[in-house]
């Protein structure tokens, strides 16, 4: 199922060393989903993905959450976090400077605006 979704079915017999970066990323993501986990912890899951695969990945993450699961992921693309996440944590220079429900953290701003505000001021908005 997942190999078909990510268009890897025809390459499954090939050596992984022959895969492109994007294909390796897809394979890693498939391996994360294949056992139908209730919790996924992903580091930069969209890096190396083409737009179609990124959309598939977002839909799979939403589907997992809709079924009662949870996804924790890191990203440097704040727009992705803002669109996908119910809860968010902002880390600046290794320090947790904001966390909570997305709407509580950002208010009427964008996540990017909040990030730069706390990064410039080097403050913790949870205090």
Regions found by a protein language model. Name each.
Residues 1-11:
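Conserved ABC ATPase "signature" region
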Residues 36:
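Conserved catalytic motifs of ABC-family nucleotide-binding domains
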Residues 40-44:
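Catalytic Walker B motif of ABC-type/P-loop ATPase nucleotide-binding domains
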Residues 55-67:
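Helical segment within the ABC ATPase nucleotide-binding domain
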Residues 81-83:
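A short, surface-exposed alpha-helical micro-motif characterized by mixed small hydrophobic
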Residues 99-100:
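ABC ATPase "signature
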């Amino acid at each position: 199922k997942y190999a078909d979704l990510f268009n890897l079915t025809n390459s499954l017999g090939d050596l992984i060393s022959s895969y492109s970066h994007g294909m390796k990323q897809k394979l890693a993501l498939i391996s994360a989903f294949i056992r139908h986990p209730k919790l996924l912890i992903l580091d930069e899951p969209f890096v190396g993905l083409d737009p179609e695969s990124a959309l598939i990945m977002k839909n799979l993450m939403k589907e997992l959450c809709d079924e009662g699961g949870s996804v924790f992921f890191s990203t440097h693309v704040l727009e992705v976090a803002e669109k996908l996440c119910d809860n968010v944590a902002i880390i600046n220079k290794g320090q947790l400077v904001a966390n909570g429900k997305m709407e509580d953290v950002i208010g009427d701003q964008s996540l990017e605006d909040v990030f730069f505000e706390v990064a410039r001021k080097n403050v913790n908005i949870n205090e």
